[in-house]
């Protein structure tokens, strides 16, 4: 077969535009493609919801790829291991309650299984704003990451969603935008972002599940964004809480939307 360069380009452009137009409106929009966002996307899509994930970087997986200080191993607890088992990610016991997995296998498998479940991922897109109406958050305002990086003055486009998840990690970027736009109206003790505390894995992991919640109407936080918003410690390269947080936020949204 003789290959046609223009036909290759046309296939890419047409295929991408079909996806982008299809996801102008959806059930759930996820900001951030780390472990909690991917896990949430997997469970939401598997439940039959229309869900897309927007990641500003080229690669998906957040900080999971690098394990701890570039030693590409991660640790999970018993509950996190249950999720690894469900995804088919291998792990080895280290001590009672501690399980070690290969970070590259874990990250790539999370991404693959989430996509196969029906999650649509748009990488290289940054979330620069939200849509807020009387009923709460109704969508995201998007631009190419390259536009943001180059500092170009280019207006964004919008997508509509019935629920939004901030899974952007330590920076809790979507919640920051909401706080900046509306002031101290968040579902926190003083209505503002409480700020992430210093490393304490035991306390941070326990707090993470409690802090996975609806922080503003139709806006949920998961993963490290949860602890950053609610003032709990960071945890380092233990990822069980991140996986469980992703599953938990999916369960909350499924219960609300289904």
Swiss-Prot record:
GO biological process, one term: thiamine biosynthetic process
EC number: 2.4.2.59
Task performed by this protein: Involved in the biosynthesis of the thiazole moiety of thiamine. Catalyzes the conversion of NAD and glycine to adenosine diphosphate 5-(2-hydroxyethyl)-4-methylthiazole-2-carboxylate (ADT), an adenylated thiazole intermediate, using free sulfide as a source of sulfur.
InterPro entries referenced in this protein's UniProt entry, alphabetically: FAD/NAD-bd_sf, Thi4_fam, Thi4_prok
Enzyme class, spelled out: transferase
UniProt lineage: Archaea, Methanobacteriati, Methanobacteriota, Methanomada group, Methanobacteria
Record gene name: thi4
PANTHER family listed in its UniProt record: THIAMINE THIAZOLE SYNTHASE
Pathway note: Cofactor biosynthesis; thiamine diphosphate biosynthesis
Species of origin: Methanothermobacter thermautotrophicus (strain ATCC 29096 / DSM 1053 / JCM 10044 / NBRC 100330 / Delta H)
UniProt binding sites for glycine: 234
UniProt name for this protein: Thiamine thiazole synthase
Keywords: Iron, Metal-binding, NAD, Thiamine biosynthesis, Transferase
